[in-house]
Amino acid sequence: MAERSQNLQDLFLNTVRKSKNPLTIFLINGVKLTGVVTSFDNFCVLLRRDGHSQLVYKHAISTIMPSQPVQLFEAEEGSREG
């Protein structure tokens, strides 16, 4: 069965959503938001913190910085880390 192609943005957001890894989102206007991604679609990200949800439009996001490293791809057999 052919492996389904997934874009990097969706792969990243889905990984942090599943892991419930807290992250910081910086908006283009300089605002800093922190929380956990609970859902996302093509246009927005739902961020949860202290029992409250915030709907953040992707076009307003500058940077997403997870609090812990995110591994998006499995290491290939035989590969070594430097």
Swiss-Prot record:
Molecular function via GO: RNA binding
Cross-referenced PROSITE patterns: SM
Protein name stated in the entry: RNA-binding protein Hfq
Quaternary assembly: Homohexamer.
Cellular compartments per GO CC: cytosol
Signal sequence, renumbered to the chain: none
Protein function: RNA chaperone that binds small regulatory RNA (sRNAs) and mRNAs to facilitate mRNA translational regulation in response to envelope stress, environmental stress and changes in metabolite concentrations. Also binds with high specificity to tRNAs.
An example Gene Ontology biological process: regulation of RNA stability
Sm domain span: 10-70
Lineage top rank: taxon: Bacteria
Gene3D superfamilies xrefs: 2.30.30.100
Alphabetic keyword roster: RNA-binding, Stress response
Similarity comment: Belongs to the Hfq family.
InterPro entries: Hfq, LSM_dom_sf, Sm
